[in-house]
């Protein structure tokens, strides 16, 4: 067994993958990036671990004793993912990267349907927006509870 740290590269045969710590959805979230070449064309591929602020109703992102750095971790992960070289984005939940519609477009003749150099940034921006909505909801619920309403 080998522990891979943030920014370290792991070689698997001819493939070199780089680890990127992306905690938030889980404290140990890790994303990976690598370059893949076919003939003269090389693309940067990123597998981005879940950035979704989904949890049970009892888990509070704004005040959580078991994971007090969750909001800070999410922001760090959003910045990391936004900065990744990312021609092709892969996610644990295919709908997060619009994989199904991209594959359909590819089947209908678009050879570059999977390629989007802004995909990682878009994913991070969308996840940040969902987290902000959750934080606003928690804050308004806390305010209502404090007022006794």
Per-range role (PLM):
Residues 111-149:
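C-terminal regulatory/interaction regions
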Residues 6:
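Residue(s) in the substrate-gating loop at a strand-loop-helix junction
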Residues 1, 9-11, 16-118, 122:
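Metallo-beta-lactamase
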């Amino acid at each position: 067994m080998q522990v891979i740290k943030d920014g370290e590269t792991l070689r698997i045969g001819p493939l070199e993958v780089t680890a990127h710590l992306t905690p938030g959805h889980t404290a140990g979230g890790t994303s990976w990036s690598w370059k893949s070449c076919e003939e003269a064309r090389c693309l940067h591929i990123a597998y981005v671990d879940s950035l979704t602020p989904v949890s049970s109703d009892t888990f509070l992102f704004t005040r959580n004793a078991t994971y007090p750095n969750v909001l800070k971790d999410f922001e760090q992960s959003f910045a990391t993912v936004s900065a990744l070289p990312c021609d092709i984005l892969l996610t644990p939940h295919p709908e997060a990267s619009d994989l199904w519609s991209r594959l359909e477009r590819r089947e209908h003749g678009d050879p570059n349907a999977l390629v989007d150099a802004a995909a990682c940034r878009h994913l991070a921006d969308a996840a940040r927006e969902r987290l902000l909505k959750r934080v606003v909801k928690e804050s308004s619920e806390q305010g209502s509870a404090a007022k006794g309403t």
